[in-house]
């Protein structure tokens, strides 16, 4: 009985620590504040510091000092400190944190959250003409999939090509972007920028290949830019894309998914149609 009660307490403590961590990463500082008292003492100090950082409350420095040494390197605490510094406009001290952390997916816990900070800090560095540092900050994102990964790879390629003037460095980033997206708007963007990259390298064959690829998506901005690169004299031809025969149209409107999209549109809820229309 005593042993199982002791184990139960351990599980309960672990559960509270996990919940506190979840609330902190999600920025839910009210929920976090409510459960801090149920945490073991060391973790109370850690999550009090995180709660103050997230809510931008008073006594930040004092709260961080009180965090026990063994928890000072907690990735969540580092992330909250980074975000706090970035919001205060302290780019240099934000860089100290980014240079100090283990840049692995395992350590970062939520590399997608870190990416948002990297992206904002990267743009600040571009504005200050610190192009090499901006590239390092943006490209060391430690992600391998998802929309944030695609965004990070595109931005890394863009900095490499447009600011560092290193098309060979940009090439892989734009390929990573292209092969991780699905929508025409993104596929055309990836193809166009690969076309530009190969153009800068002086590889006409690959440049044309990617511009042609981009020009398949004429209803998008980058599709039209690609078209202008390979067929500057030809006007846009969307006619072939616009023709639908009557039989196909009738069958199309009988499909269940089409009816759902139609209904969502009618209810002004078309933000939910994106996933169906992919």
Predicted feature residues:
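Structural motif corresponding to the intra-repeat A-B loop/turn of tetratricopeptide repeats
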Residues: 26, 88, 128, 163-164, ...
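TPR/TPR-like (Sel1-like) alpha-helical repeat modules
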Residues: 21-25, 37-44, 54, 86, ...
